[in-house]
Design a protein with these regions (language model features):
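Non-catalytic, surface-exposed connector residues within folded enzymatic/regulatory domains
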Residues: 18, 33-34, 87
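Active-site acidic-Proline motif in GNAT/NAT acetyltransferases
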Residues: 27-33, 61-62
Length: 98
């Protein structure tokens, strides 16, 4: 008991109604057990209960499992800025609270 097996972080942006999913990871030996789903669901429920308008995230398209998970939770790909804030990011996604 008490072992950390995953992490997630939501960070406020300049727009107080928009949060960024800045970190989400699950230890390799605990993957494909629904932990990522639980972490992402917590973030979405937190955003809903605090009336946030949306969650944005940056990722890399080669992270197929992560992109698939985000899409399953309603995240949609949107246009990325010319200068990405993250060196390895090549996809930007948004979840809209409706």
């Amino acid at each position: 008991a008490g072992n950390i097996i995953g992490t997630v972080a939501l960070m406020p942006t300049k727009n107080k109604l928009v949060f960024e999913l800045t970190k989400m990871a699950v230890k390799p030996e605990y993957r494909n057990k629904g932990i990522g789903k639980k972490l992402l669901k917590k973030c979405i429920n937190y955003s809903k209960s605090n009336n946030h308008s949306s969650i944005i995230l940056y990722s890399n398209k080669k992270l197929n499992n992560a992109i698939h998970l985000y899409r399953n939770f309603g995240f949609k790909e949107i246009k990325m800025e010319k200068k990405s804030p993250y060196l390895r990011a090549n996809i930007k996604m948004v979840w809209i609270n409706d």
